[in-house]
Amino acid sequence: MEKRALVTAISLSMSLLALMLLVTAIFTDHWYETDTRRHKENCDQYGSESNDQKNREMPIYHLPLVDSGNAKRNLALMKPIHVGSREEELLENWRAILGMGILETECGRPLFSTYSGLWRKCYFQGMDRDIDKLILKGIAERCTSVKYHFSQPIRLRNIPLNLTRTIQQDEWHLLHLRRITAGFLGMAAAVMLCGSIVAAVGFFWEESLTQHVSGLLFLMAGIFCTISLCTYAASVSYDLSRNPPFIYGLPSDVDHGYGWSIFCAWVSLGLTVASGCICTTYPFLSRTKALRSKTARESSV
């Protein structure tokens, strides 16, 4: 009984630690990070003859493709849009941007260091003076929400029909991947909490049964967590390979990778699976040992 209680206590401690790490991962924003400092240094060093890096603080305007004769409409189209704005605004003005020669080179697209999680995408503070100035002036926002709902892209009127359809389909698939990631992470946390409660109840009632049930719940939570983490990795790869590449892709000298939040999620997965294996295998091992000792006593008699 003492060994069984010790095993239950160890598995319960591991599951609670795993739950804390998973909740930390869910509510923090360092799942994926990009560092553009090396890209900026290369552009400043090798692209000094061009005006590429000046575009980081230069506003772009809606340029009408055809003069419709409507002065009010043309004036409305001249609203300034910064090149570091959201992807939808860059897509809106993609022809004007290409016409100005801003995206002819990799240095023409202004890139800033970012970190993102399940709910927000933010710019690093204090890493790039340009984006800090833009945020201070109110031109850019420090953080933007990650979309989990599909909205009709009414701003894509300046884009060819085939490219518009491609963007819409990619957006739809990406939203599905995001929903799967968030949904399975939520289920993993809920099942893990239920398993911890069942394991705690095992100290007072039917320890063998509750230990087995909690182990199965921990393994189920591990499956959910594995699905969500793999889906998140797929969504990141899918997002970086979207069209048009000058909006969604990253140059080769931009450092990007997973952050400490997803590391917490992977550690949580390991602890969850370990506690589940302990809780499910120990009852079988103890039962087998008891049967062997009983058989040995009967044979000796």
UniProtKB/Swiss-Prot annotation:
* Keyword Signal recorded: yes
Q: Which GO terms describe its biological process?
A: negative regulation of osteoclast differentiation; regulation of cytosolic calcium ion concentration
Stretches assigned to the Cytoplasmic side:
205-215, 280-301
Q: Using the UniProt annotation, give the residues that carry a glycan (glycosylation sites).
A: N162
Gene3D superfamilies given for it?
1.20.140.150
Topological category with respect to the lipid bilayer:
Multi-pass membrane protein
Question: What is the protein name for this chain?
Answer: Transmembrane protein 178A
- Whose protein is this, by species? Danio rerio
Q: What is the name of the gene encoding this protein?
A: tmem178a
